C-alpha cells in the first residue's frame, strides 16, 4: 500500500517525509491554507530526493498546471477539476502524468466515475470527499467505508477523505493501492506533526513498533 502526504508547505516537512512516504503533495490553490506559491514550490521540490512530488490544484487550468509542473520537474499533477481527453494528451506530450479525482457524492455512482477515470492515462485516480463536506462516517471518515470498499480494488485508486492515525486501520483493511492524507497528520494547517505521521504509518503497516 502506497502513501501520499498532501499539503506539504515547509522545508522541514519535506525532510521529514522524503523517502518515508511514496508521494509528497504540494498544493497550488490560493483558497487553501496549505497553498504554496510557484516560486517557493520550486524551492521545496528541489529538496525531494526519494519520494515522488505531486502538484495539486483545482483552479489552475489543466494545461497551465501541467506547464508549471514540467518547468519544475514535477512528474505528476493531481487535478481536482474536469479533465478532457486533450488534457491527458497534452500532459503526456509534456512528460507529466495526471492524477484525476473522483468525488464522492451521496446517491451518485462512484464506481462509474472511478471506472471512467481509470480508462484514461493516469498515475492514480484519487477518491475524495466533496470540498467543505461536513458529513462524517465510520471513525470520522468523510466517505462511507462501504463506498470506499467498492472502489478500493478497481486499480490504481487512492483513498482520501478524513483519514487520520486513529481511523487509518479501517482503510488499511480494504488494502487499497494508496491512501492520501493531509490534515490528519497536522498540528495546524500546513504544519506536519512527526508523531502523527509515524502513527499513521504504523496504522497502515508501513512502520513497526
From Swiss-Prot:
Enzyme kind, highest EC tier: isomerase
UniProt-recorded name of the protein: N-(5'-phosphoribosyl)anthranilate isomerase
Stored SUPFAM superfamilies: Ribulose-phoshate binding barrel
GO terms (BP aspect): L-tryptophan biosynthetic process
Enzyme Commission number, as recorded: 5.3.1.24
An example molecular function term from Gene Ontology annotations: phosphoribosylanthranilate isomerase activity
Taxonomic source organism: Pyrobaculum islandicum (strain DSM 4184 / JCM 9189 / GEO3)
Record field: transmembrane: none
Record keywords: Amino-acid biosynthesis, Aromatic amino acid biosynthesis, Isomerase, Tryptophan biosynthesis
Reactions it catalyzes: N-(5-phospho-beta-D-ribosyl)anthranilate = 1-(2-carboxyphenylamino)-1-deoxy-D-ribulose 5-phosphate
Pfam families: PRAI
Pathway given in the UniProt record: Amino-acid biosynthesis; L-tryptophan biosynthesis; L-tryptophan from chorismate: step 3/5
Listed CDD domains: PRAI
Amino acid at each position: 500500500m502506497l502513501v501520499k502526504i498532501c499539503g506539504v508547505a515547509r522545508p522541514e516537512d519535506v525532510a521529514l517525509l522524503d523517502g518515508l512516504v511514496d508521494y509528497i503533495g504540494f498544493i497550488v490553490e490560493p483558497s487553501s491554507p496549505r497553498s504554496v506559491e510557484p516560486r517557493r514550490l520550486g524551492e521545496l521540490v528541489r529538496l525531494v530526493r526519494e519520494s515522488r512530488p505531486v502538484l495539486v490544484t483545482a483552479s489552475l487550468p489543466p494545461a497551465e498546471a501541467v506547464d508549471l509542473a514540467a518547468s519544475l520537474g514535477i512528474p505528476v499533477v493531481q487535478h481536482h477539476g474536469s479533465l478532457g481527453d486533450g488534457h491527458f494528451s497534452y500532459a503526456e506530450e509534456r512528460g507529466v502524468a495526471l492524477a484525476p479525482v473522483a468525488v464522492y457524492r451521496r446517491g451518485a455512482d462512484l464506481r462509474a466515475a472511478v471506472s471512467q477515470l481509470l480508462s484514461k492515462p493516469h498515475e492514480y485516480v484519487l477518491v475524495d470527499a466533496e470540498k467543505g463536506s461536513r458529513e462524517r462516517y465510520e471513525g470520522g471518515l468523510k466517505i462511507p467505508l462501504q463506498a470506499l470498499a467498492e472502489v478500493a480494488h478497481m486499480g490504481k485508486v487512492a483513498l482520501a477523505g478524513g483519514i487520520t492515525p486513529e481511523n487509518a486501520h479501517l482503510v488499511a483493511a480494504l488494502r487499497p493501492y494508496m491512501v492520501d492524507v493531509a490534515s490528519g497528520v497536522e498540528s495546524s494547517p500546513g504544519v506536519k506533526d512527526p508523531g502523527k505521521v509515524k502513527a499513521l504509518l504504523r496504522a497502515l503497516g508501513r512502520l513497526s513498533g
